């Protein structure tokens, strides 16, 4: 070619050979000693068709010449697919400067393409590595191929590989010259005159027909002093998209080039290149190459100075890239990374938009010239010293470009981007559906914020709410009764108050501390030394032994002290532990008890305060809840302040006979004082009229959203109107009569008084006994629902509610219909029962589990570990907002030690979340099946008792769980039972139930067959859980193909082990009876289990538990434990 002649003539100049080398390298992409082979391919329709295509080839499919196409025989292929991180780690490794270090030939199997692509290698074992076979480091130009016997299109067997320079008559440098040149210039020249930086291992692996287009990948290992910039890879990954193809999850510098006229590949080549390495040489139009060569020849003949060499480079750039610049044409300032770390795009005009954006970072050489760029010449040229400084650059146009390259490198590093990990694009981790703030574990400090002391900063709104709440708490007067040790001793001494306090502990907390205190109290009364020793051992076994179910939380030093005193027990041996627990009980449990409805004294004080402040100013003792026919005590309660803004004042009447008394509603007249009685009645009537007007005026109320809601108080209004009519009759009867008819007048007024008493009693019943229904009819007057509890005196279901403008709560009685109505009002958002929490106040730590019902995360709220359950249309398979509200309502208003308490709930867009206390030991299902957990028989009884107590409380609240199973029972760090998942819970109503609710293995037979079932379905589920607890196995084989509903409906049950304790097997059999009425209630189950766990308590109460547990008398409604004879 003309190029070779001009190249020899221009060696006298400094760097003219640079251009000639660049021009000659246009057609040497196929010149890597025939190491790779290719075949003509057509686009496959699926990835499976790739197995028949050899994808290790040169860029254009040329095997032995610069034009034309070659083919190779197919064969058994294997795919290598590794992660992207493997590829990154490979690039970051130090350069292999000795080719003998490779124990396998290129392409090296430990290197993969990443990005979901595969390298297809020949299944034949490779030949032993020989230095002469290395296409880069070897200078002999071996014609052998690593692919074995590859047949070209022209014939079979191995064929020698010839470069374009050899075919055109160009004389190549010999091995010694090239090796010397490599040593001096720290560069390597291959047989095709391609120049590579020493220490850079380059392999060209064209990927064919993946994603409906052929691609070429060049992977290389850059030297350690030039690490790869991963950020640019991420930017390529994020922006790269190729039409009509599968999505590219990563691409390293792809650009499209027109294929050679002689190539058989129809689709455009997509060239992928790593950073800081030499790009692939693609074959371009020969006409353009010849033009470039002629330009370089003319320039080289006219260049005699160093600056002429720069003009030569400028000419090349002007003809190809239209970059009319000086030395800076070879480099372009980049704001993202240095030129060593930037991809090089060969054809920016035909590349996709994302490629054009990134290709602007680098100035390429001519469009038709796609050669490696570091230039060198023979030793006689004298140009080596001028080009050594340009090794850091991809393109070195002249010896004078070193300064411009340095300037570019300085400009490149102006903006340093923060390193980002690749998990954002190449990770299978679930993203958080709600942007909770991350938990700052690495800081190890708690962030102080305005709303709480936690890991999350609060906003201004939460701070304002907190200040309002604290201000409101300061306004509320403290309870009159104080929690002191003397008061506590007095409480547990009285049997009535002891039962009330025990009921409070059962509903809110555990009874270990209280039971220990009572046992020690009994222990101190024993005088017999033998009995004292026996009682001491029993107390140790119950409260201090490591296997004790009711073990106390005390220090090990105190346990050792008690253990040492067991040999010679004294009455004072438990004093240290008793003082410690006494402080805990008084400061925690007893303090909450004295201000709770369980305390009879607090209830009486509350009634007095409520009556004096709201209804009357009298100083007489008033009992609002007891109505008698005696008119003197006829002081009935009235609706809250919301119904009437002005309370009725007592009329001042002079009673000579003390027969007339004032009332909120009416006052009776006296025959001996007609005028005064009439005035009193008229005064009371005027107050009633005023009250009636106030009630009618408040019938229209506006809520926070500006929507008007009417208040329906027809019952109250009708009673008030009837009372007013009675008052008017009383006044008319007491006036206009003569003194001689006083007796008749007295009878008339007495009748009116009786009418008043009857009407007052009816009103009292409406307000006290059945008034909660009226509250539900106007739910906007409810400020907060505090809790629902069982009254310890009359065992009646009660609810504590705070009404608008009231500081103290009001207690109402409930029935099943009221409970159902309450839940419906909560679902309608008319009543709020939970604490509203902003997602920014919750910090998230880690993912726990995901399922069809939502996702669960572990996080922190106000410095406490919480479980965060996230639900929503995008998170749940079947999301029901009403079910979510119902679950939050039940978990918020029910307070029990064995029920998971909802700490609050919130919303973010269309996703919802609620917080519960975090249970470290997971579900009971997984805990039982983990064989590493050593679970004693006592611990299993503890599990059974905790579940029974929680379900006893739920059933007492008229709630059916309907999905009771071991997966919905969690264990805290101290293995305390917590029942969760109240989404399917319903108010006990046997006439309106949904069939097939729950999990089949735990479902009662009546659920499959009928819609009319009761709370006994939970008892059946409890029997299956007992089977799991005491066998540590599933009730039904999970792998067996069995029809559980048919088995259950036929009366078939899991087989109980023969070595199971009789007391346990009997209760299981009784709980899964086919007929629901034959199953025991949880009240009886709890009593029986407690008699097993606490035999000394049962003995001290005079009760003995039945050993058979199969007697029908014990389950037919009688008490479970029978008294001693």
Curated annotation (Swiss-Prot):
Its localization reads: Cytoplasm; Cell membrane
UniProt xrefs under SUPFAM superfamilies: Protein kinase-like (PK-like), Regulator of G-protein signaling, RGS
How the protein is activated or inhibited is described as: Up-regulated by cAMP.
**Where does the chain bind ATP?**
848-856, 869
Q: Where is the composition biased (Basic and acidic residues)?
A: 121-136, 690-710, 736-748
User: An example Gene Ontology cellular component term from the record?
Assistant: cell cortex
Q: What name does this protein carry?
A: RGS domain-containing serine/threonine-protein kinase A
Q: What is the species of this protein?
A: Dictyostelium discoideum
Q: Which gene encodes it?
A: rckA
